[in-house]
Structures are given as structure tokens and as C-alpha cells.
């Protein structure tokens, strides 16, 4: 069977500006995959950087994979689809990842999938409609409300109408804006103000009064459509869904730490799990996730951000792509990321069994420290993202270590202590303390 993995990118790519390191390397992971599944032929059609598929920066490629690189000038949907078709694949799989400032790569991958399906090539990728629903937070909100899923109450703010008098000088009174403020006043405090099209929690504001909400919306920072929602209180979780055409696996959830504003931050949060305590009504949650998967007709990998508040599960966001927890779930299941992608496509069988794992952040590390970290016997993998042109400290990047794969939570916490002792110069107290708090949350429930 010939399998094509495809990966796209909408941003300008310049080698050397962003440095992505994965340990084990993509090359070694491809080699291990081929050794385990010699019956498969692997092709990667990609625009750089090809996150998770290619060792960007060192230009080392596995001899067990054929790479087809797509230049920016040839990156139209039709051209990429043609390049995939030229490989004569038995199946094509979208390997979609996140981008800034807009988390929209699943939309392009869905358009490519539409072309491939028209050419009778089996393709694992979410539909265009699904990708658009997940990309736009307001459309997500509408979908959830219309289908009776628990989500926060909110008010949509259309930016052009909110400032309609700027382009229509005849307007003396902006009725739309007054209506927005009237609706916001009916929401329960505190509130979170979201960019409807932004990545994750970037650009969000948490406010504790209606006056603060009004101030944010009237400020220069408000330069696009916004969604103002009630800011629900409770622990934060993530869960993933794998499969297609009604055949889905819903994982156990992982619990997430939050920042000082109560938001999950990709660069700062700690993940720990699985969470199975009876208090959290996991069977009910999984049934709702299956209902979600079937309504969206998911195809491949998807991730859902959740909150457990007032003894109920609430959906915060849906990501129609590989997420920041996908590798951690692969570790929990005892398989590689590539095997998880194949499993989500229905190509290989895996018996889902979840061991305790943790995803912990470190500051940027040198090569020696990265390798030392990766060589710990309980470490599944280490990733580092470095922005070499960062202008602010918070933009320089981070390292993350995924470790554990243990039968008991205590064993993972023992592993954490080893890391704290071995890498005391680099272990930041906020992450260590957050990990301890998450463990207590799991143990106490």
C-alpha cells in the first residue's frame, strides 16, 4: 500500500528563522515505522516546514520516505493535489498542524481533499464545512448551540457594524453597538473576549466588569470580529477523537494547567492524564464526543478543549487538526505519532489503552541538554521551537518533554522528581508547581 502524507503552509517560509527540533528525529521515527510496517510505502508531499514530518534545518531525510517538496510559487490547491495524484497513492492523509496568526491550515487541506476525492483517491481529511466551523469561533459557537452541546453563553461582535459610523458619515447613533452592549450586560461575569479567527488563547482578554468589557471593545486593540463569552470556572481538559465515517475512538481526557488569567496557553501549560475519576462522568463525556464526531463527520484527528464546571462538561473549542496534545496521547497509547496517524486513518489496528503521561515545558535548551533530556529512559520525546528573530522574551520559544507511559500516577510524579533533580537549572517553578497541582486534582477526585 502506498500512503501519501501531505502538509501545507500559508505563511512565508524562511529557513533558519524558526528552528524546529524533534527527538527522536523525524528521520529515525520514519525508519522505525518502515521497519515495523515493511508492507507500506511512504510518500510525503509538503510545503516547508512540514512540522512532524521532516527534520527542518538539517536537511536530513529518511531513505525510507519519498519527499516531494512544494515551492511557494506552486502551492495552489490544484497544484498540490496534482503532485499527490502523481504519486498514485492508495490513500492520502492530511497532516494538518497549527499556524499563527490564523489557525486555518485545515481549510486548505480540506480543499485539497475535495480535489483528490473527485479523482477517486481515498483521502483522510475533514470536510471543508467542518474545517470552517472549527476555524471560526463564532461558527463553532453557533454549531454547538444549534446541536444542544454545553457551551458558554456569548455575544458576537461584528467589527464593521460595531464601528459603522466611521464609513457611513450619515449615522448619528450606532444602534448595533448599543445592542451589543445591552446583550453583554445580560451575561454573567467574568467574561472572556476572543478574536473569532485567532489561534488558541492568543489575543484573548478576561474582564471582571462590564465597564472593562466595554473598554476593551472600544480600544485600538479591537481590530476585528470578537466573541464575548461568559468565562466559565473549573478545571481545563483536552480530549481527542480519531477515525472517520462513523468509526471513531474517543480518548480519555488530559487535564491542563492554566495561566494567571485562567486560560490555557500552548507555550505554558502542563498536561497530565489520563483522567478517569468517576466525578468527571467520563462515559457521558465520551458519548457526547461521539455525537460531535458524527455530526461533524470527522475524518482523521481532531481535538476538543473542554471545561468541567458545575458538574457539567462544556466545549470551549474544536481543533480539526493535530493538536498540542496529540503526541502526548500517542505516548499514553504506547505508539508513535506516525502510528497514531495511521490508526486514525483506519490503516492499522491499535487497542486503545491509556497509561499515565505528562507534557511539561522547559525554556530553550542547548543541544547537549536536549539530548540528555531525551535519553532519560522514561522520556517519550522532546520537542523544541525556537524563534531566532524574536523581539520579546515571550516569543523566543520553548522546549517540551513528554514522559511517563506509567501504570500509576505516582510513577509519573517520581519521574518528574528525577527531572527536577537532573535539570534543576532549567526546571521553572511555575511548571513544576502546576504539575503538582494537576496531580493533586487527579488524586483527590
Where are these regions (language model features)?
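Conserved hydrophobic "DFG−1" position in protein kinase catalytic cores
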Residues: 206, 241-243, 306-308
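Peripheral (often C-terminal) accessory segments that flank ATP-dependent C-N-forming ligase machineries
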Residues: 340-445
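ATP-binding N-terminal substructure of ATP-dependent carboxylate-amine bond-forming enzymes
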Residues: 1-123, 163-165, 422-432
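Active-site nucleotide/adenylate-binding loops and adjacent lid/helix of ATP-dependent enzymes
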Residues: 4, 133-227, 233, 245, ...
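A short glycine-rich, hydrophobically flanked beta-strand micro-motif that places a catalytic Asp/Glu
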Residues: 299-310
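ATP-dependent carboxylate/phosphate-activation module, predominantly the ATP-grasp catalytic core
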Residues: 211, 230-296, 319-345
Amino acid at each position: 500500500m502506498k500512503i501519501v502524507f501531505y502538509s501545507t503552509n500559508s505563511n512565508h517560509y524562511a529557513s533558519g528563522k524558526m528552528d524546529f527540533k524533534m527527538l527522536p528525529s523525524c528521520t529515525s521515527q520514519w525508519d522505525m515505522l518502515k521497519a515495523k510496517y515493511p508492507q507500506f510505502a511512504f510518500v510525503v508531499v509538503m510545503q516547508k516546514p512540514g512540522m512532524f514530518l521532516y527534520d527542518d534545518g538539517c536537511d536530513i531525510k529518511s531513505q525510507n520516505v519519498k519527499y516531494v517538496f512544494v515551492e511557494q510559487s506552486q502551492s495552489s490547491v490544484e497544484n498540490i493535489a496534482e503532485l499527490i495524484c502523481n504519486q498514485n497513492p492508495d490513500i492520502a492523509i492530511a497532516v494538518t498542524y497549527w499556524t499563527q496568526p490564523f489557525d486555518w491550515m485545515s481549510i486548505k487541506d480540506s480543499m485539497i481533499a475535495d480535489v483528490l476525492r473527485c479523482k477517486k483517491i481515498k483521502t483522510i481529511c475533514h470536510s471543508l464545512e467542518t474545517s470552517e466551523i472549527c476555524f471560526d469561533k463564532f461558527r463553532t459557537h453557533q454549531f454547538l448551540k444549534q446541536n444542544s452541546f454545553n457551551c458558554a453563553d456569548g455575544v458576537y461582535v461584528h467589527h464593521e457594524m460595531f464601528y459603522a459610523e466611521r464609513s457611513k458619515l450619515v449615522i448619528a447613533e450606532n444602534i448595533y453597538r448599543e445592542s451589543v452592549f445591552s446583550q453583554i450586560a445580560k451575561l454573567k461575569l467574568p467574561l472572556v473576549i476572543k478574536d473569532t479567527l485567532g489561534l488558541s488563547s492568543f489575543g484573548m482578554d478576561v474582564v471582571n466588569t462590564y465597564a472593562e468589557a466595554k473598554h476593551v471593545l472600544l480600544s485600538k486593540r479591537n481590530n476585528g470580529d470578537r466573541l464575548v463569552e461568559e468565562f466559565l470556572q473549573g478545571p481545563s481538559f483536552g480530549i481527542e477523537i480519531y477515525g472517520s465515517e462513523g468509526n471513531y475512538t474517543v480518548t480519555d481526557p488530559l487535564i491542563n494547567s492554566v495561566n494567571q488569567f485562567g486560560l490555557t496557553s500552548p507555550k505554558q501549560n502542563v498536561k497530565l492524564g489520563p483522567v478517569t475519576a468517576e466525578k468527571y462522568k467520563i462515559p457521558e463525556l465520551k458519548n457526547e464526543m461521539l455525537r460531535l464526531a458524527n455530526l461533524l463527520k470527522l475524518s482523521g484527528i481532531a481535538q476538543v478543549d473542554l471545561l468541567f464546571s458545575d458538574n457539567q462538561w462544556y466545549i470551549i473549542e474544536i481543533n480539526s487538526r493535530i493538536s498540542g496534545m496529540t503526541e502526548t496521547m500517542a505516548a499514553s497509547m504506547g505508539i508513535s505519532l506516525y502510528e497514531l496517524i495511521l490508526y486514525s486513518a483506519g490503516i492499522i489496528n491499535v487497542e486503545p489503552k491509556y497509561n499515565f503521561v505528562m507534557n511539561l515545558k522547559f525554556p530553550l535548551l542547548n543541544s547537549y541538554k536536549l539530548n540528555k533530556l531525551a535519553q532519560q529512559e522514561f522520556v517519550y520525546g522532546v520537542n523544541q521551537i525556537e524563534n531566532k528573530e524574536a523581539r520579546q522574551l515571550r516569543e523566543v520559544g520553548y522546549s517540551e518533554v513528554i514522559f511517563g507511559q506509567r501504570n500509576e500516577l505516582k510513577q509519573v510524579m517520581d519521574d518528574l522528581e528525577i527531572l527536577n533533580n537532573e535539570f534543576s537549572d532549567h526546571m521553572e517553578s511555575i511548571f513544576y508547581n502546576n504539575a503538582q497541582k494537576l496531580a493533586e486534582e487527579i488524586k483527590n477526585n
